[in-house]
A protein has these predicted regions:
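Short, well-structured N-terminal submotif of metal-dependent ribonuclease cores
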Residues: 1-50, 60-72
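Acidic, PIN/NYN-like endoribonuclease modules and their adjacent C-terminal/linker elements
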Residues: 1-13, 46, 119-152
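Residues that scaffold the ATP/ADP-binding catalytic core of kinase and kinase-like folds
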Residues: 23-25, 56, 139-140
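Short alpha-helical
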Residues: 29, 51-52, 135-138
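Alpha-helix C-cap/termination motif
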Residues: 37-40, 81, 123
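Active-site-proximal, substrate-binding regions of enzyme catalytic domains
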Residues: 48-102, 120
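Active-site neighborhoods of divalent-metal-dependent phosphate/nucleic-acid chemistry enzymes
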Residues: 84-135, 145
Length: 152
């Protein structure tokens, strides 16, 4: 009798855009199911996630929506999370890509996320493109990316 080692189950691969990331980081409405969905998953994104998250945290702090302590805590989390995510660099190849949604015309930074997710998906299937932005969800769907069933 031979015993074959069981193949380890494949980790879910989730592409997280900035809207979903900030929702979790700032504990906005709907953050709990998003956070639960990311548990144990391989988290993918663009390096733009870090830039956009930090910029939004500065904006919120300047508007008084975050205390200095909250700002510092959030910035520290972004720095730690940068080491948890697999991040796609913004390269000339990504900029030259012809990948565009069929109908939707996304903003430039949204397009960076879409092209990055598409690149990851081409390398190895992603299980879900996670976003809080309805237009971004629709654009991802147009590109054939698996999307959340509904914006959470």
């Amino acid at each position: 009798m031979s015993v074959r080692p069981e193949k380890a189950p494949r980790r879910r691969r989730l592409y997280i855009d900035t809207s979903a990331y900030l929702c979790i980081l700032l504990a906005e409405e709907g953050w709990e199911p998003l956070s639960k969905e990311t548990e144990g998953a391989e988290l993918l994104s663009s390096v733009m996630l870090i830039l956009e998250a930090k910029r939004n945290l500065v904006r919120l702090a300047r508007q008084g929506a975050l205390t200095p302590e909250q700002y510092k805590t959030c910035i520290d989390h972004v720095e730690q999370d940068a080491n948890v995510f697999v991040l796609r660099d913004l390269t000339l190849d990504l900029c030259r890509s012809h990948v565009l949604p069929a109908v939707t015309t996304p903003r430039s930074l949204d397009l960076v996320h879409l092209r990055s997710a598409h690149w990851f998906h081409d390398v190895e299937r992603i299980d879900r493109f996670v976003t809080k932005d309805e237009a971004q969800r629709e654009a991802a769907k147009e590109l054939g990316l698996p999307v959340t069933r509904a914006v959470i």
